[in-house]
UniProtKB/Swiss-Prot annotation:
ATP binds at residues 158-165. Produces ATP from ADP in the presence of a proton gradient across the membrane. The catalytic sites are hosted primarily by the beta subunits. It holds the Pfam family ATP-synt_VA_C. One of its GO terms (cellular component) is plasma membrane. Keywords: ATP synthesis, ATP-binding, Cell membrane, CF(1), Hydrogen ion transport, Ion transport, Membrane, Nucleotide-binding, Translocase, Transport. The gene is atpD. This is ATP synthase subunit beta. Its EC number is 7.1.2.2. Belongs to the ATPase alpha/beta chains family. PANTHER family: ATP SYNTHASE, ATP SYNTHASE SUBUNIT BETA, MITOCHONDRIAL. SMART domains: AAA. The lineage of its organism: Bacteria, Bacillati, Bacillota, Bacilli, Bacillales. It catalyses: ATP + H2O + 4 H(+)(in) = ADP + phosphate + 5 H(+)(out). GO terms for molecular function: ATP binding; ATP hydrolysis activity; proton-transporting ATP synthase activity, rotational mechanism.
Length: 473
């Protein structure tokens, strides 16, 4: 092992000078350790990752934890390899940090646990699978209008507080309960409280047994937030490549991955580009996203919550992410104000899987008719606001009448929200979803009150609600 010394500390960026011509490779992990000397002192055990070579003997590194207590002249050791994290079944039901150290209260991992480096190249072309298969989520609005693809990348777009994390929790729950699939959850730069709540909720529901969790939260330095997505992805790739699993990989929130990169970029001496983001934004995003894919062995399907700064979709961070996505689920604040949950915008959400050759003719026709009804209703809203419903023709009145029922029927009660709503969650198979909307469009339920359609699963629940309201069915 080659040793060097810390020569400069700039917040989360640390320069290390090595002697006799040894220069660690880019991405190598470098350790700075110092045992605790006094009773009240805490020892230092810091991992740095090489980012740049400066001249013949100095490397500029990014710290994976706080640099408090680091001084010039401290000894630094080149480990000779990138950061490596545990993989395989030992990770299930456990919580890790960016370095793969356990941060839950359970017993330590076995000493012989397999470890893989977090930096690796994407699968080659001949390893990729070209089959398109739909992933059923049991959430009506998603399965009908913007279906997810196995091995695809799905973006969950929305501002603050419109329900991204709740939707992710429901997806983890549904995939584990209905498909028995493995999930990996990477908490990237989000609230520690949310991660804590998610862990306990998943422990209570038993879903945790099928999930590995990795966290680099808001309070951590940018190095940890920038690399924690790769730690989670490495765990997911092992389940895909070595066990042939179809893995769900959640990133909450991919914007924080970009944000962490931009925090470090200026300190690394790079010239900022548009809106102050790092000039390497597209490259960093591509290196992460290209590893998420279906191979001939298994698949990693990624669902990424994407915070949209100031609800501006042209911001470089969300705009760069768009290029990689197969489907988008857009959450709309106006729908939360109307009490429609999940607040998925049925007109703005898209999927390349919504094609007759993939979902079938009937599903495609029903989905398009639902969208055209809602689009017509949206166009009529200005007229209604100015002149009132009475000024509409009979045909338009019927469109509004049905569109409101469709809008409410797109809402659904979630398993993970039972404690807030007091209603049992529902999982709706795609066939049932298509049948329900087809019957609403045919006018079969025009006589039922709109409130009967709120927060239900199958169409039968609407009929039950109507009976409870005293309506003859």
């Amino acid at each position: 092992m080659k040793k060097g010394r810390v020569s400069q500390v700039l917040g989360p960026v640390v320069d290390v000078r090595f002697e006799d011509g040894h220069l660690p490779a880019i991405y190598n992990a470098i350790k700075v350790s110092q045992p605790a000397t006094g009773e009240n002192e805490v020892g230092i055990d810091l991992t740095l990752e090489v980012a740049l070579h400066l001249g013949d003997d100095t490397v500029r590194t990014i710290a994976m934890a706080s640099t408090d207590g680091i001084q010039r002249g401290m000894e630094a050791v080149d480990t000779g390899a990138p950061i490596s994290v545990p993989v395989g079944d030992v990770t299930l039901g456990r919580v890790f940090n960016v370095l793969g150290d356990k941060i839950d209260l359970n017993e330590p991992l076995p000493a012989d646990a397999q470890k893989d480096p977090i930096h690796r190249s994407a699968p080659s072309f001949d390893e990729l699978s070209t089959e398109v298969e739909i992933l059923e989520t049991g959430i009506k609005v998603v399965d009908l209008l913007a279906p997810y693809i196995k091995g695809g990348k799905i973006g969950l777009f929305g501002g603050a507080g419109v329900g991204k994390t709740v939707l992710i929790q429901e997806l983890i729950n549904n995939i584990a309960q209905e498909h028995g699939g493995i999930s990996v959850f990477a908490g990237v730069g989000e609230r520690t409280r949310e991660g804590n709540d998610l862990f306990y909720e998943m422990s209570d529901s038993g879903v945790i047994k099928k999930t590995a969790m990795v966290f680099g939260q808001m309070n951590e330095p940018p190095g940890a937030r920038m690399r924690v997505a790769l730690t989670g992805l490495t765990m997911a790739e092992h389940f895909r490549d070595k066990q042939g699993q179809d893995v769900l990989f959640f990133i909450d929130n991919i914007f924080r991955f970009t944000q962490a990169g931009s925090e470090v970029s200026a300190l690394l001496g790079r010239m900022p580009s548009a809106v102050g983001y790092q000039p390497t934004l597209a490259t960093e995003m591509g290196q992460l996203q290209e590893r998420i894919t279906s191979t001939n062995v298994g698949s990693v399907t990624s669902i990424q919550a994407i915070y949209v700064p100031a609800d501006d979709y042209t911001d470089p961070a969300p705009a760069t992410t768009f290029a990689h996505l197969d489907a988008t689920t857009n959450l709309e604040r106006k729908l939360t104000e109307m009490g429609i949950y999940p607040a998925v915008d049925p007109l703005a959400s898209t999927s390349r899987a919504l094609a007759p050759e993939i979902v079938g003719e009937e599903h495609y026709a029903v989905a398009r008719e639902v969208q055209s009804t809602l689009q017509r209703y949206k166009e009529l809203q200005d007229i209604i606001a100015i002149l009132g419903m009475d000024e509409l023709g009979e045909e338009d009145k019927l469109v509004v009448h049905r569109a409101r029922r469709i809008q409410f029927f797109l809402s659904q009660n979630f398993h993970v929200a039972e404690q807030f709503t007091g209603q049992k969650g529902s999982y709706v198979p795609v066939k049932e979803t298509v049948r329900g909307f087809k019957e609403i469009l045919s006018g079969k339920y025009d006589h039922l009150p709109e409130d009967a359609f709120r927060l239900v699963g199958r169409i039968e629940e609407v009929i039950e609600n109507a009976k409870e309201m005293g309506v003859e069915v």
